[in-house]
Amino acid sequence: MSAITPSSEVAAGITTPDFPRDIRPRSIREMHVPPSDPVPDVPIPTNTTGKPVYYIYDGSITRASGQLVRDHSCDGPIHYTDPLWECTLFEHLPPSHPGWPNDCVLPYDHNMSPYHRVPIRTICGFNYWETDRLDSTNASFWPALYKCSGFRRNYPWRYSTDQLLAALDMTPEQLVSAKSCVSVVALLNTMNWTSHHLSGLRPQHVHYCMSDWSVQFTKEDLEVLTPGAWFDGLLRVPVDPRVPAIGLTKEQLWTHPFVILGWLRLALQ
């Protein structure tokens, strides 16, 4: 019996592919690897574009006990049962989903929270540490964050100095001492703060807040432009794209306790 030879059309369909076969285990092939390219900027919502869907943690500190509200797309077990911090509106699903929005409970040091990492100065400059690796307590950070979050209803520079000082539990004498600090450590010690009070910030944000005005903005510029020019410059600080992409929204960044402190130090010179 003679061998059966396939037609040219069939032969074209059974040729070997140009790329080698992936012999990695399926679990490895399906593992999500984040891209190494810089993460694109999240568009700022307007009245016409609507609200973008991404992770938001607003720092509310209502004490709650119970299990972690997990990702709705995750089938794995819920593994957090300790007392947790309650944060509002964990935005993961699109607004059209029947379960959106839902109040969620998340620990402050959850690895999906922007407050999970703290910039710490090391021998080689700033580095990131997880909040659960720090020895000092963070108990005083959350009340300050909660009170400062009230300034999100309006621009923080529109509030009086007394209101900003009250949110930080800061006295005028402390402000005088804070204005003379030239290092982050000295400023934290003056406020009786710990490294946890830098939670959520990037090293570039910390450097911007510690500078005697930025290179782009001076006190005279603010008098000519708008009082919010310094805050606008904070948003435009180039951050390292290699760090985790989860970060603070502009309102969260503007009302961060350390940012409010930096504004008070500079605006009252």
Swiss-Prot record:
Residues 1-23 are annotated as: Disordered. It comes from the Viruses. Belongs to the aquareoviridae NS4 protein family. This is Non-structural protein 4. It comes from Aquareovirus G (isolate American grass carp/USA/PB01-155/-) (AQRV-G). The lineage of its organism: Viruses, Riboviria, Orthornavirae, Duplornaviricota, Resentoviricetes.
